[in-house]
């Protein structure tokens, strides 16, 4: 028999995520979370030891979602659209857990465990990008050496990781809405353009036009 999810625990995680995203994790205390939920701090501490415990549980969910987003196709050769889809899923995950990226350095300095787990995610992202790009080379979509693919994967991972922080310092774009994720995805995809064969570069341009409408 499957155990029922604990509603209070789920509410704490849901509300914490919303507050962290809106206000920034350093600006939210467990008392703030308890007040928002209209529960006592003692009730919150029954489910989570402290705020860092809440952050770790949210990170677990982020990590699982990110792992799913980075899965490469297994039963066929990769296509250009696969990278686009992967990036879309990754950017959606980044947006859903955006507090992790906004406060990334602070969080990783505070927790060695999170630092190690985030490093694993970056390693997994690099490997996934290399795998898909190598497949695109084999099918004639990309023209790039192994060294170029490694550098491309590094640049894609770096741009994706810090895209949200970059956007936040642009004065004209201080209000973020989910449809604007398309702009970030487009910028990352343009890193591929110099390595695409002519026909595939036109294909990328058509994909971009459809996506940014």
Where are these regions (language model features)?
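Helix-turn-helix
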Residues: 11, 19-53, 57
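C-terminal peripheral helix-coil segments that are non-catalytic and often amphipathic
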Residues: 165-213
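Short, basic, alpha-helical segments at the C-terminal edge of helix-turn-helix-like DNA-binding modules
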Residues: 60-66
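N-terminal positioning helix adjacent to the helix-turn-helix/winged-helix DNA-binding module
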Residues: 8-15, 152
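Secondary-structure edge/capping motif, primarily at the C-terminal ends of alpha-helices
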Residues: 70-73, 101-108, 136, 140, ...
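Amphipathic alpha-helical segments used for helix-helix packing
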Residues: 94-116, 130-135
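Hydrophobic alpha-helical connector segments
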Residues: 71-99
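Amphipathic alpha-helical packing segments from all-alpha helical-bundle domains
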Residues: 113-139, 150-165, 182-194
């Amino acid at each position: 028999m499957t155990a029922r999810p604990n509603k209070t625990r789920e509410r704490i995680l849901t509300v914490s995520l919303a507050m962290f995203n809106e206000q920034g994790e350093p600006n939210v205390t467990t008392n703030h979370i308890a007040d928002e939920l209209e529960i006592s701090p003692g009730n919150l501490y029954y489910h989570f030891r402290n705020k860092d415990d809440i952050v770790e549980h949210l990170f677990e969910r982020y990590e699982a979602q990110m792992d799913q987003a980075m899965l490469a196709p297994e039963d066929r050769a990769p296509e250009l659209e696969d990278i686009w889809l992967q990036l879309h899923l990754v950017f959606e995950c980044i947006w859903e857990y955006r507090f992790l990226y906004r406060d990334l350095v602070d969080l990783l300095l505070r927790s060695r465990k999170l630092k190690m787990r985030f490093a694993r995610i970056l390693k997994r992202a690099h490997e996934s990008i290399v795998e898909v790009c190598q497949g695109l080379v084999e099918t004639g979509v990309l023209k790039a050496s192994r060294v170029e693919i490694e550098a491309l994967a590094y640049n894609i991972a770096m741009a994706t990781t810090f895209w949200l922080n970059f956007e936040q310092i642009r004065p004209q774009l201080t209000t973020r809405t989910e449809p604007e994720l398309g702009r970030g995805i487009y910028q990352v995809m343009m890193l591929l353009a110099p390595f695409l064969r002519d026909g595939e570069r036109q294909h990328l341009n058509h994909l971009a036009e459809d996506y940014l409408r």
